[in-house]
Amino acid sequence: MQCYTSNSNKVSKIVQWLFCLFCGVILCACNMTKFVPRGQYLLNDVKVHVEDNKDVPAADLVKYIQQKENTEILGFWKLQLGIYNTASLDTAKWTSKNARKIGEAPVIFSPELVDASCTQLKRAMNNKGYFRAIVDTTMQVKDRKVNLAYHITPNEPYSIRNYSISLDNSELSSVAQNQRYTLVHNGMQFDADILNQERLRVASTMRRRGYFYFDQEMLQYKADSTRGKQQIDVKMELQDYIQMLSDEEKENIFRVYKIARVHFHIDYDPTRLPEDKEMYASSRDGYVFTWVGKQLLREKMLIRNCPIKPGDRYNENLVERTYARLNQLAPIKYVDISFEQISVDELDCHIVLSRGKLNTISAEIEGTYSAGDWGIAAGVGYVNRNLFRGAEELSVDGRGSYEWRQNGGRAIEAKVSAELKFPSAIAIDLGYNFQNRPDEYTRSIFNAGLEYTFKQPHIGLNHQFRFVDISYVYLPWISDAFRDQFLQSTNILKYSYENHFIVGLGYSGNYTSFRARQPHRSYWNLYYNLETAGNLLRGLAKPLHFNIDQESGNYELFNTQFAQFAKADVSVTYNQMLHPKHRLVFHADLGVAIPYGNSQTIPFEKRYFAGGANSVRGWSARTLGPGGYRGNG
């Protein structure tokens, strides 16, 4: 009893503290300058305005501001500052310590940082070709708070009058002068970012062609703005220190290197001696394998997922692809690739692999609440990430739940699922779900599938082809009361509690225009799905003499009608960036499902619906749309 009282008091104190904190935040929101020293000001708001120019969005310039206001929620509420202001001057108090720890101290206005911000903004505008840009500031001071605005007048930008290339190496000159791929042209607006991207393009192309030691930092630009009004001459050339090297030193830089051998080090420890009994090594066709303990992956599997091949030229793209391919293998946690020069024009490639957890077991227990019914659920999962020593990933999950219903009944559900993923992006899944409601029905659901996933990350597009999608719903028992109330011929729910087969295939994909290099630009997300079912079975029904249901006239497989339908879904989301920390999101869904042939309605699990705790809460789950109906139950 004493223990219970103690815990209860602790919980009560925590609840009281949270309530007081909430009230304090609301009250302190009106006194944001509580901890602002006398004679100083709180930086309340910072804005950036660019006059009559859409080439340089204000959102892209915010990152150059050296001092920003306190963090805001919903664009106006400084919640963390409000929490901080609930603290008292006595820092020893527990509530004061936590308020200062959770909250955010006020940002004190600094004129020095304003000057630094103006310098950075001026430099950013210069990099975009606006060398005559003017940066001004305006301040509004009220109640010891400062609202600060940066006003940028770009004026006319400079353009490139003449772009020239002066490089000693013929291969390098050929790459830089390639008009098909170059990013810099005469007449374009001067842009330091594009010039830097051109350096990266030239250097990357050289490294793809075998020039291992070539780097973008070896290239430089010289600009002359005295040639014309608001015009610049730009010349690409080698860095001064490169031009001063001897011919032999230049030859090392402009030499094509080949891969001699590829070394795989699996769980390699350089402190172990070669004669260590737990360390093993083997070699084949230019590949060398070194591992400690039990071999992690088959050698053929590693070779298949390594685009870097002995005898090939060094290629930067192949290095990136090797990183991507090896990191996708389930048992591998860490990948590191390095190169060692072993002769005048040869490199050895060293790939270090570190294994992750091969086996994982998880368990969970939770309380559930659905449509007014309380329950309890427990689940267990097992994952093997290297089932056949070929990076195959097996996942097995089981879950059981017990629910107390408002009408005094109960519901039991048990389900198990298994999925086997192969490195080739093929996955096989199986599942079984058992539902028992003693006052209503008993239902079993079997499903199986075979799918292939194909990703194109460079354009933000993923594809998923589901070659086999099988579902079998079987209800061995339905109570008479439930049948009379819900399953009359005029009630739409009747079709939700019928045995049926679904044998289909489908394709789905998703696309995003988000680019990590431009995180503050607005972007689209698109998801689409196409699926059909029953066409193959309907084509085989007549020649194979399938049974025909006498009541509906539909074909049956194993005394069960199979569904035939087509379905298409599209989901579009547009993220309008208002500020680096704020965005407005528009979302639209469109879907159509058409039964035909062997079906008069869409199967229950493939229908569209709304309602429920996680949807439109005014309606119970699956009782809202699309369309409407009036059941007789």
PLM features: residue spans?
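N-terminal secretory signal peptides that target proteins for export/translocation
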Residues: 1-13
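C-terminal motif of bacterial Sec signal peptides marking the signal peptidase cleavage site
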Residues: 27-29
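Interaction-mediating elements
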Residues: 31-328, 360
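Flexible glycine-/small-residue-rich
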Residues: 50-52, 152-156, 167-169, 236-240, ...
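Short beta-strand elements
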Residues: 131-139, 212-221, 333-340, 461-468, ...
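Transmembrane beta-strand segments of outer-membrane beta-barrel domains in Gram-negative
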Residues: 208, 360, 410-591, 631-632
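Outer-membrane beta-barrel initiation region
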Residues: 247-424, 496-503, 511-521, 539
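Extracytoplasmic gating/loop element in the C-terminal half of outer-membrane beta-barrel translocons
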Residues: 584-633
